[in-house]
Each structure stands twice: as C-alpha cells, then as structure tokens.
Amino acid sequence: MIGVTRRSGLALAVLVSSAACAGAEPVAPPPAPAPTAPSAVAVERFTPVERRPVADATTTAREVVVAGRTRAYRLHASPGAPALPEGRPLALVLHGKGGSAEEMERHSGLNAAADAAGVALAYLEGVAEGWSASPEPTDLRPDPDADVDFARAVVDELTGAARVDPDHVYAIGFSEGGMMALRLAAEHPDWFAGVASVAGQLPSPPAEVRPTGPIPVLSIYGDADPLRPFDGLSTAPADTPAIGKEPPKPTISTAETVEAFCRAGGADERRREEARPAAAPGGTSTSRETCANPDSGLRVVSITVHGGGHTWPGGTFPYRPAVVGATDRQLSTADTAVDFLLGG
C-alpha cells in the first residue's frame, strides 16, 4: 500500500458509467482545442502491442491510500514475470453507477479477453457506487479530482509492484465509469495509450470536459438507450429510474463526444462501415465509424448499436431490459475493447 498526496493542477477525465433518461435535447459541444502534432512518444504509444497470452492469472483484492483515504481495487494478473521485457500492459476498469468492481469483473467478460492478450486488469471501486465523471463538486464528491488521483495512484503502484509498462496503460469504463474513462482521456491523454467507453459521454457545460490532446478512443453506444440518450442529456426527466446515489450528470451527445476526440487528435480521415444486419426481427445491429490521423496512427472509433440500450454488449449483467433496453449478443465488448486498445 502506498500513500499519495494531491498533485498540483491534477484534473483527470475518465469514462464512467452513468444513468439518465431519454427525451433530452442535445447540448452544443464545447470547442475543441486546435490539434497539436503528436510527439515521438505518442506515436510509439499508438502502435500495436504484442499479445502474450497468460493461463495463470488470478484476482487479488488490493488497497491504496490516496490523500489520506483508503481506496480499493481488484487486480487480475499473472503472478509471474511479464512476458514482455518492458512490462505488462494494464487496463483500469471502471464500473457503472450503482455497480461495483466485483460485479464488473463477474459480468463483463474482460478477464478472458485480457488473459488471451496478456493484459493485467485493475478493477477500481468507486465511492458510493459511482465516480467523479464531472469536474463539478457534489455532496457525495466534494473533491471532484479524487478519482483522478485514485487512477494515477493505482498506475504508479502497479508500475512497480506488478511490473506494468507505463507506456501501455489503458482505461475501460461502463456507463458512469465510461464517462470517467473519457474524462481521464480528455484531461490526461499523456497518462493513457487509449480508452474504451461503453454507454458514456462527455459532461456538458457548465462543467464541461474538453479533450486536450491526441489519444485513441473507442466508443460503444446504443442508439435506443432509455437512460442516457444517444443524443445527450440536458436534464433528467422526473421519471428517471433511481440508479446509484446521485442524479445523472448532464452530457453532450455521443456524436459530439466522439468528434471532440477526433478534433483534438487531428484525426480527419473518415471511414464508415455499413450496419451489421440484425440477427432476428426486432434484434440489434451495429455500424462503425472511424476517424484517423495517418501520420500518428491514432484512431477514434465509434460503434453504434442500433436498437441497443444502456448495456454492455455480450455481457451477462443482470439488468432488466424493461429498464436498460436491449443487449446486443453478437458483439463482444470485452474482445472488441482489448483488441482496439492493443492496436488491433
């Protein structure tokens, strides 16, 4: 266990899962900063990572002290030495609002996907079942940067304790966890080699989060999400289901979120793939849009699940379809996220 003090100017944006309701008007996205040329280090981080499968990974409960507060996480990794000389890749995993690290590990399918690629996973535990996905303080989260500090502390600890390669650290989040992952990516693109967000969007004004540099981002979102609409959420309707211990945070649309990261990374080469047909009448289908910067290798990918709800495609989360909507069973979010982050 290590102690970590507050760093000056620390404000990390992470993709975190959050619950909200349909029927909101889209909010105009904040202006993105002018793209900057990626550094040589950044270009290296955007190149594919060699996959080295492991068969002996186990999960252990760990703690780290951050600004005097003990925070918990679950580390899933091989106890042996990393197969790669520079260390093992690491992905921070952020559960949704009202969820837990244990639930995320049990139902996401990420352990199997990560083991097949040799990636260590750190399932972080949120405070009061949620995250500071927005830089705006709340009664439950008076310090909006506490979760940013937590993420940094876990990476710092595991860089030594688990032989993690600091140049290949990622974040994966669902719902409010997806929002937290996006916040981390936006505010600290130099900390991560990529993030994957499922059912997450960037916060909207007045507590907006703006991407500040190039970083690979994967967004997976259902266009029939009944909790946090695909077109964003300005205010939650009165009949929003109670999820977690705080009201949902306002966000911009999925398209605006993705576009903000494209612009920040100078990724203006566009490609769209046609929708995968639904497996059955009334089922879900997917389409994919990619923006890329061919000079750096950076990609921002948006997968839309047509007919999909506020769900983790391919997962086994025990959520009622009447509340969260339909779950796509053909797409494996776990495999897709790990493959994207490692440069597949």
UniProtKB/Swiss-Prot annotation:
Region of interest called Disordered, as start-end residue ranges on this chain: 265-295
Biased composition (Basic and acidic residues): 266-276
Organism the protein comes from: Nocardia uniformis subsp. tsuyamanensis
Taxonomic lineage from the root: Bacteria, Bacillati, Actinomycetota, Actinomycetes, Mycobacteriales
Stored InterPro entries: AB_hydrolase_fold, Plant_Biomass_Hydrol_Est, PLipase/COase/thioEstase, TAT_signal
Disruption phenotype: Disruption mutant still produces nocardicin A at levels near that seen for wild-type strain.
Broadest EC class assigned to this enzyme: hydrolase
EC number of this enzyme: 3.1.-.-
Family named by the database record: Belongs to the AB hydrolase superfamily.
Post-translational modification: Predicted to be exported by the Tat system. The position of the signal peptide cleavage has not been experimentally proven.
Full protein name: Putative esterase NocK
Additional record remark: Part of the biosynthetic gene cluster for the beta-lactam antibiotic nocardicin A, but disruption of the gene shows that NocK has no obvious role in nocardicin biosynthesis.
